Amino acid sequence: MLTRVKSAVANFMGGIMAGSSGSEHGGSGCGGSDLPLRFPYGRPEFLGLSQDEVECSADHIARPILILKETRRLPWATGYAEVINAGKSTHNEDQASCEVLTVKKKVGTITSTPNRNSKRRSSLPNGEGLQLKENSESEGISCHYWSLFDGHAGSGAAVVASRLLQHHITQQLQDIVEILKNSAILPPTCLGEEPESTPAHGRTLTRAASLRGGVGAPGSPSTPPTRFFTEKKIPHECLVIGALESAFKEMDLQIERERSAYNISGGCTALIVVCLLGKLYVANAGDSRAIIIRNGEIIPMSSEFTPETERQRLQYLAFMQPHLLGNEFTHLEFPRRVQRKELGKKMLYRDFNMTGWAYKTIEDDDLKFPLIYGEGKKARVMATIGVTRGLGDHDLKVHDSNIYIKPFLSSAPEVRVYDLSKYEHGADDVLILATDGLWDVLSNEEVAEAITQFLPNCDPDDPHRYTLAAQDLVMRARGVLKDRGWRISNDRLGSGDDISVYVIPLIHGNKLS
């Protein structure tokens, strides 16, 4: 096993140094190369590229920055720019999509097919959708949707997620659309129940009568349901959060089901934003990042999920289910690899229940390869993958073994909410979404400084200003090709990864409040 792990680590390091086609986030899984693709590879639909332009964009030497040809293709005058990697993989494995979704109440039985009521629009006037409020029950509720997917070990999962995740989101929102329309009434515990309007004196039913189901008891035909036990009050935004979490899970399950019929390679991180009823819901699974820049202030809207940030979750899972380690790994963390000559000595270690460090006596099991190895961007789960949440990766195994890594990976996103109605936003207040290709070389502060320097120098009425701002960020992260590779400010190493950036102006959210 030690030889296999050393080989995996060597392959990874060699890929980084030589710019191999291997992914920074993980190794390749079992491919279905003889199977048809679920969807053909391409760049985001809203870029409006021809096939020739797609091929020209895949120049790993020139690395041309792609931007929107027509700003009306994205709502809110959203800016977008992207660039391919410096040779890490053949294709740009990032994917993006942006749509306006219309959610209508589900009619009839629940089906497993994508929601037909979701209206996909690839070309939208800048002002369209600014008054996104329900007009009637038949029209449902409209919401804006932006997404970024960072693929690894192939673009298959990212392409599929960019085409289908919005359908799962729409489907999950269908059950609650009528509840969301009426913000004055708390969501019922059970769908179909009427809101409680019974006066206080009508709720004095005894516990015995309640259990017998007598007149006035819950479920009796003569009165609305009466609650003997206290119930949690669930706010409306928690329903939306739950819908997004469920949609991510369903998307991951669909990839798992369909990989036997289609070639869906690798996995992907997922970062999405839904603007619904005056609130931004930012859901992230992976190491992409979202920040709001408001009046120069930085407001983080996501967390990154890596072997280091999720160490305790991963260690606890391995502790509870040691068979997942294949008798080849230890769930304990040590400052460095344990050597056989150190058996019987006391060494610093850290377990799932610890944020600090303690000493333990080294045993034979401690000589196994650690579940989490490396630091920072080089940290890996089982020496294989550097991101712990996302979609896909169902066939990913430890190099030259039958140990699956998927049990340690989660599709669950973290969802954060931003209420647009609480602030009056200016033309320079924006939400930045970007894959890790940007954040690997630029800090939140550097991105905020770039935005606050760039936007004030643009005409506030210029519809291209946010696209130009996105282009500026990508250019700052990519840098300039010199004798020693791509270099950015202060002669630092530029990003050799795929980079995708949205710049979403929040001033349009003022009209939704």
From Swiss-Prot:
Record's subcellular location: Nucleus; Cytoplasm
Catalytic activity reported: O-phospho-L-seryl-[protein] + H2O = L-seryl-[protein] + phosphate; O-phospho-L-threonyl-[protein] + H2O = L-threonyl-[protein] + phosphate
GO CC annotation terms, alphabetical: cytoplasm; glutamatergic synapse; mitochondrion; nucleoplasm; nucleus; synapse
Omega-N-methylarginine modifications at: 212
Modification sites for Phosphothreonine: 113, 223
Phosphoserine PTM sites in chain numbering: 7, 123, 210, 220, 421
The PPM-type phosphatase domain, residue ranges: 77-506
Location of the region described as Disordered in the Swiss-Prot/TrEMBL record: 110-133
Cross-referenced InterPro entries: PP2C, PPM-type-like_dom_sf, PPM-type_phosphatase-like_dom
Enzyme Commission numbers on file: 3.1.3.16
UniProt keyword list: Cytoplasm, Hydrolase, Methylation, Nucleus, Phosphoprotein, Protein phosphatase
Enzyme class: hydrolase
UniProt entry tagged with the keyword Transport: no
Listed GO biological process terms: signal transduction
Gene3D superfamilies registered for this protein in UniProt: PPM-type phosphatase domain (3.60.40.10)
Function: Dephosphorylates CDKN1B at 'Thr-187', thus removing a signal for proteasomal degradation.
Family: Belongs to the PP2C family.
Protein name: Protein phosphatase 1H
Originating species: Rattus norvegicus
